[in-house]
Amino acid sequence: MPKIMLRSWSNTLVSVRQVTQRNAGHRTPGVDGQVALTSTARAEMAVQVHRTISTWDPIPVRRVYVPKANGKRRPLGIPAQMDRCHQARVRHALEPEWEARFEPKSYGFRPGRGCADAIASLFTTLKGRSKRVWIVDADLSAAFDRVDHGRLLAALGSFPARDMIACWLKAGVIENGSFTPTEEGTPQGGVISPLMMNVALHGLEEAAGVRYQTSGSGAGDTRPDSPVVIRYADDLVACAHSREQAEQTKARPAEWLAPRGLVFNDDKTKIVHLTEGFDFLGVNVRRSRNGKLLITPSPAAVKRLRKRLADEMRALRGSNAAAVIAALTPIIRGWAAYYRGVVSSKTFGELDDYAWKLTWRWAKRSHSGKPKGWVTDRYFGRFNKFRNDHWVFGNRAGRDERGNVPYLIKFAWTPIVRHQMVTGTASPDDPDLADYWAARRRRVKPPLDSYNLRLLTKQAGRCPLCRDPLLTADQPPQSPQEWERWWLSVVRRAIAVDYLVHQDGRGKPDGNQTRLIHASCRRELQARTRRMPARPPATSPRLA
């Protein structure tokens, strides 16, 4: 099967489409500066990718740095777009095989799994009277930069594209015009790098002493006396029954990781009791005095958000209300969407109070000579007709033809929805589980408004023109920042509302209908028909 996938023209087309249109970084070039942004360029790239299946020579990656939450910078390696297309093609051939092997409690960078599943797994493991009260909160030190190439390639066995993967690993890095060879690690930023990290870490659970029941009604569940390891990429948590078991659960993986070039980060790895609490994937997990397990947004995450909101408002001094709404709306939507699956109601309310204070200060500063009543009448009111809230920040000057005032949404308007955790080792690649994944997609609803959510459900989540998923093809966003980018790139720019006029049997208009399609598909449709697009309806895709 891998050989068939590697030679498949359909795989090439899907890979090129994913890299050049669907991925968030499709406009980001590598060292060659080349990106395919038009239909003609994408078609030429697909032909070139398919012609060079066995002859492609990988290009060094371009080094860039992105800021981390702790103030440091994370190095990323951006491959050329041709390399990314080849990597996507190889990943599609390799991933199904490894998805059938991976541990059930590994959630990072896997199709159909994500942060919400890892957090839900923690809740299931620790809730109630669970005796696993000692926690190993572990973090691998620079895992992507240190993984041993030899061990990784040995794990791939006889995979047909193994040599090409080796070339990607050894391609090197170009930074400020100078070339540096890569003797270890897999660069963050590559399409295939997350899969390589999961392959390298496969077996960590067994090394930690995790054992599963193999028979009876509990087959597939963790043994009652066994620790539980929940991993998201290079970030993991081990839940043990005693301090001694926790020490062993930390020591055994450390020995297993050493030959693979990986070590625990001593500054971030610690053993704590569940009542002390710990942070994992942006949430704080602890058991309260009454024995109830609480999972809330971590204080560090809340502090970072408050600082960012304050910085944004400071930068907006002298701007108008429309700029304030445009700048803050994606931040609020993204943060609320990520934390809507945990105990966030109190935090959302506190953040709404903080955001209101920031907007009030901005309004007072913008009109320092005006009384409070004038400022209130100009910028605050009941602009959301579905909410009985008269202190919503809005832009009265931007009132549309229907009298609607653009306004700033609030955190608390995002409903708390418990996440439905993925079951065991279920994989989207398993044809026997097609009904399970279809039902799961219906239950796990994206944070859209009710109108567009109905359209999305009616279309089974797919674009009627290309039949690809409309929102997230591989997995949902995995952080508040990714949710923010998802809102900006997917909902605002990548999805369009198509306006249809149906006719009855006599050729007369028979009502108006709308459908959601990819913006790129709409542009291609307009290019083919050479017609001007009809006026879109008033309702557009937006988050709830």
State where each predicted segment sits:
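Short, charged surface segments at domain edges that flank catalytic/cofactor-binding sites
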Residues: 428-484, 508
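Conserved polymerase palm-domain catalytic core
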Residues: 101-113, 117-277, 474
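Non-catalytic, polymerase-adjacent accessory regions of viral genome-replication enzymes
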Residues: 1-45
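Histidine-centered nuclease catalytic patch
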Residues: 470-516
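Extended C-terminal regions of large enzymes
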Residues: 354-454, 543
